[in-house]
């Protein structure tokens, strides 16, 4: 108990550091996620006895890393669905659907195939890594867009793509990390089984989210009590996730669909303006803490990454992911006439990898063959994405004249 108390105090200290970094980043009008990663890198590279146990607990504890998925994902995804008005999403449906569905599959196939042949990774490892790299994280991008006054269209596209491709990427991640080798041995029958499993995950998760989203939308019609309605939203997010996972479908897709129903239909029939404001404020605060811990953890993980002798494969992985993203964007949106070449370029470079990729990588079982390789490449690409792409995004937007 005494040891847990010490670790808790140290994690609290890390949270205090995180919140302080966020406050300073906001004063400087810089993306707080990038600032957190940079501070995490500094903390990870220096040995400070006062937070050493907390660093070890965050980066090596199986319990903590399992908690990341079951606790943080419903929070991050649920909050995002509440923030994106459905009519905004519908107005950009062609671009969002092209990126989220065509783009995610193309990205996964390109990255997985290249990683297998060029990086000489085992098949399951290559496509597990590819699934992780197919999920985008718009947090840093949206904060930059907001600070510069980039048109709402681009924010809607980036956030809409992320919400849908996160669900697809998680399903692909599960198939690649658990079932891929078995299906490969089955030949064409395995391909059919893989497609069936994907549809089961996706459709089953969507149905769970639809039912629970509708149910809680009806429930909040009865009450005009925002603390209670906040509690109902939490029950929806976590309930959707765990019920879907219990029935071996996609918890991520369940949260996204349930959140959209609740945030759009539920808000129209059962939320006062005050309630909607307070629900958004509550989840803003919770999401800030969750993201702070995840992005700080990305930086802290540097002490567990063996860079020596791996620079070649790391650079190769970064290039493969960048090329895979480019192919995915142009194939996924090539038929969308409303999208300009400048907008495609911004979408391409703004497809950062972040918290979901990290959370999924850490959730891999310790006995997964190639876990260390996946962690090495995932954290390396995420660091490059957040720091290099993130810090060059603002100059790119100005260069393209999109403000």
UniProtKB/Swiss-Prot annotation:
Alphabetical list of Gene3D superfamilies matching this protein: 6.10.140.1330
Highest taxon in the source lineage: Bacteria
Substitution effect: residue 224 to A/E: Decreases activity. Increases Km for Na(+) and Li(+)
Subcellular locations according to the entry: Cell membrane
Transmembrane stretches, start-end: 7-27, 31-51, 66-86, 99-119, 125-145, 168-188, 196-216, 219-239, 242-262, 282-302, 311-331, 373-393
GO cellular component terms, semicolon-separated: plasma membrane
pH effects: Optimum pH is 8.5-9.0 for sodium transport and 8.5 for lithium transport. Na(+)/H(+) antiporter activity is detected between pH 6.5 and 9.5, whereas Li(+)/H(+) antiporter activity is detected only above pH 7.5.
Stretches assigned to the Cytoplasmic side: 1-6, 52-65, 120-124, 189-195, 240-241, 303-310, 394-403
GO molecular function: potassium:proton antiporter activity; sodium:proton antiporter activity
Membrane topology: Multi-pass membrane protein
Keywords linked to the UniProt accession: Antiport, Cell membrane, Ion transport, Membrane, Sodium, Sodium transport, Transmembrane, Transmembrane helix, Transport
UniProt keyword Iron present: no
Example GO biological process: sodium ion import across plasma membrane
Outcome of substituting residue 137 to E: Decreases activity. Increases Km for Na(+) and Li(+), but does not affect pH profile
Family stated for the protein in its record: Belongs to the monovalent cation:proton antiporter 1 (CPA1) transporter (TC 2.A.36) family.
Free-text function comment from the UniProt entry: Na(+)/H(+) antiporter that extrudes sodium in exchange for external protons. Can also transport lithium.
Official protein name in the record: Na(+)/H(+) antiporter NhaH
Species for this entry: Halobacillus dabanensis
């Amino acid at each position: 108990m005494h040891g847990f108390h010490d670790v808790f105090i140290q994690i609290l200290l890390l949270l205090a550091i995180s919140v302080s970094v966020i406050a300073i980043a906001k004063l400087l009008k810089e993306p707080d996620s990038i600032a957190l990663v940079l501070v995490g890198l500094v903390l990870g590279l220096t040995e400070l006895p006062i937070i050493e146990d907390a660093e070890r607990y965050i980066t090596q504890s199986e319990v903590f890393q399992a908690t990341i998925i079951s606790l943080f994902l419903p929070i991050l995804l649920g909050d995002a669905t509440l923030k994106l008005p459905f009519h905004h999403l519908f107005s950009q449906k062609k671009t969002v659907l092209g990126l989220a569905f065509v783009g995610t599959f193309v990205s996964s196939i390109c990255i997985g195939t290249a990683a297998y042949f060029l990086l000489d990774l085992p098949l399951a490892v290559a496509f597990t890594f590819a699934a992780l790299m197919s999920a985008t994280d718009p947090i840093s991008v949206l904060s930059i867009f907001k600070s510069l006054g980039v048109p709402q269209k681009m924010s809607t596209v980036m956030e809409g793509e992320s919400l849908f491709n996160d669900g697809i990427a998680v399903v692909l991640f599960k198939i690649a990390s658990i079932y891929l080798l078995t299906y490969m041995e089955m030949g064409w029958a395995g391909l059919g089984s893989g497609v069936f499993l994907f549809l089961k995950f996706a459709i089953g998760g969507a149905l769970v989210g639809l039912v629970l989203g509708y149910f809680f939308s009806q429930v909040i019609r009865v009450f005009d009590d925002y603390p209670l309605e906040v509690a109902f939203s939490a029950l929806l997010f976590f309930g959707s996730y765990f019920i879907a996972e219990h029935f071996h479908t996609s918890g991520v897709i369940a949260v996204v669909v349930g959140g959209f129903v609740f945030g759009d239909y539920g808000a129209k029939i059962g939320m006062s303006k005050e309630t909607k404001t307070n629900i958004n404020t509550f989840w803003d605060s919770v999401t800030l803490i969750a993201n702070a811990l995840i992005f700080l953890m990305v930086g802290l993980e540097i002490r567990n990454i063996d860079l020596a002798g791996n620079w070649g494969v790391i650079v190769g992985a970064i290039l493969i992911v960048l090329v895979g993203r480019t192919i995915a964007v142009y194939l996924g949106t090539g038929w969308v006439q409303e999208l300009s070449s400048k907008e495609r370029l911004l979408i391409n470079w703004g497809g950062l990898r972040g918290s979901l990729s990290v959370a999924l990588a850490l959730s891999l079982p310790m006995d997964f063959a190639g876990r260390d390789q996946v962690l090495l490449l995932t954290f390396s690409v995420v660091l490059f994405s957040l720091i290099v792409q993130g810090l060059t995004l603002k100059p790119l937007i100005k260069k393209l004249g999109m403000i």
